[in-house]
Amino acid sequence: MESIFGGFGDLVVPRPKEHLGQTDLSFGGKLLPALKICEDGGESGCGGKVWIAGELLCEYILEKSVDHLLSKTVNGTKQFKKVLELGSGTGLVGLCVGLLEKNTFHDGTKVYVTDIDKLIPLLKRNIELDEVQYEVLARELWWGEPLSADFSPQEGAMQANNVDLVLAADCVYLEEAFPLLEKTLLDLTHCINPPVILMAYKKRRKADKHFFNKIKRNFDVLEITDFSKFEHYLKERTHLFQLIRK
């Protein structure tokens, strides 16, 4: 995968140095103690900073977390047990879920924050910073590659161990990676009871629509609008979708 993903850093404009150091995020007091995120100023590429789509997804999760994470809005009454964030970068969204789990004393839910190898040290640093080592685990995951045993869907008695919630924020940014991301989403949902997929995305280029047009062959793409800051994020051209495997 080095040959495919090795150019990620070269293809992305370096991040401004103001995205360096620790940021505390409480999302208007919805998350206390505040989430602590270390940004690396672009040292690890585009993943080493907080992006607006990640903030949107956190806002939605915190607003809709009644009794348990999102259970009242996207999954009936079922408790999510295995959460996977794709392209985690700093780990913002996954760490938000993990800290929410820790603060509300829900037992048994594991959150996996995943990205390419060069971002794993930053993910681990933020996990330690927020003291969610029990709730959140960092794993290397290359889009387009076969899924590891941790994430590959199982059937029968083993399906209870499957990922049941997939989170992705600002993963649609590099056109060369579109087919790889699509393959990973297809692999994760290749089962009788596929996971819920929530994808937040900031519209930047016309090319981005090619990704959504292509995945509509295998997924219904539903825009989520029923949250308090919808209009705010709409002005920022940032959207939230649920992807449902056909």
Curated annotation (Swiss-Prot):
It comes from the Eukaryota. GO terms for cellular component: cytoplasm. One of its GO terms (molecular function) is S-adenosylmethionine-dependent methyltransferase activity. Signal peptide: none annotated. It is found in: Cytoplasm. Belongs to the class I-like SAM-binding methyltransferase superfamily. METTL21 family. EFM6 subfamily. Present with 1760 molecules/cell in log phase SD medium. HAMAP family: Methyltr_EFM6. This is Protein-lysine N-methyltransferase EFM6. It comes from Saccharomyces cerevisiae (strain ATCC 204508 / S288c). The gene is EFM6.
